[in-house]
Design a protein with these regions (language model features):
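Conserved catalytic cores of phosphodiester-cleaving nucleases, focusing on short active-site segments
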Residues: 100-113
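Acidic-basic catalytic patches of nuclease active cores, encompassing PD-(D/E)XK
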Residues: 2-89
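Hydrophobic, Leu/Ile/Phe/Ala-enriched alpha-helical segments that form helix-helix packing faces
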Residues: 76-84, 131-138, 173-177
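Catalytic cores of nucleic-acid endonucleases
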Residues: 111-162
Length: 196
């Protein structure tokens, strides 16, 4: 039996499920290749449906179109517990209710599935502006956790918040966010090595 921290033992099934979720969050699927007799769009739809079915299974639901929200929030909570950070639901303040509060931080979770198309993830770019008052309202810094494709897109997509290729303009914006006690973080950086 493994333990999440010194006080909370968890069973091996829960550990295996958590590792499976972490692997999903940190592993970009391979690019779809042309196959004879099957269009790329058909393959993409199959992958999208398979991911949705898997995600719904992970959250104990079926056909929930917003499964990534519940999966990402639950996954971050589990990892925060594993790290001994005492996550809990915060009380609503100033019309806001971030996803998690710990003893030292507030957390807002932004998750995007791997087969999402278009500009669905772009709203995360302005999350720090929307939640600018959270550090003052809760008297704790805010960490915006980017999970799965959301993390990938912010490291390898058009607008980079992570990695070596962040533009000078974006660095200035992220520095301004830090002066407000707001920081974007990669989910993969939260995960203990034995769960990757």
């Amino acid at each position: 039996m493994e333990t999440t921290n010194m006080n909370n033992p968890i069973d091996s099934d829960k550990v295996d499920k958590l590792k499976e979720k972490c692997k999903w969050a940190c592993t970009k699927p391979e690019k779809i290749q042309k196959k004879e007799g099957k269009k790329i769009s058909e393959q993409r739809k199959e992958q999208e449906n398979a991911e949705k079915e898997w995600g719904n299974n992970m959250i104990g639901q079926s056909n929930n179109g917003q499964w990534t929200t519940l999966l990402g929030e639950g996954l971050v909570r589990d990892i925060l517990e594993l790290r001994g950070e005492n996550p809990r639901k915060p009380e609503r303040k100033g019309g806001f209710e971030p996803d998690w509060e710990t003893d030292d931080y507030m957390y807002e979770v932004k998750t995007s599935n791997w087969w999402v198309a278009g500009t669905a993830g772009e709203k995360v770019l302005g999350t720090w502006i929307k939640y600018q008052d959270i550090p003052t309202l809760y008297n704790k810094p805010l960490k915006i956790v980017c999970v799965a494709n959301q993390e990938y897109e912010l490291e390898y997509g058009k607008v980079k918040y992570f990695g070596d290729n962040v533009s000078e303009k974006t660095k200035k914006i992220l520095e301004l966010a830090r002066t407000w006690e707001i920081e974007y973080i990669k989910f993969s950086d939260l995960i203990p090595n034995n769960y990757k």
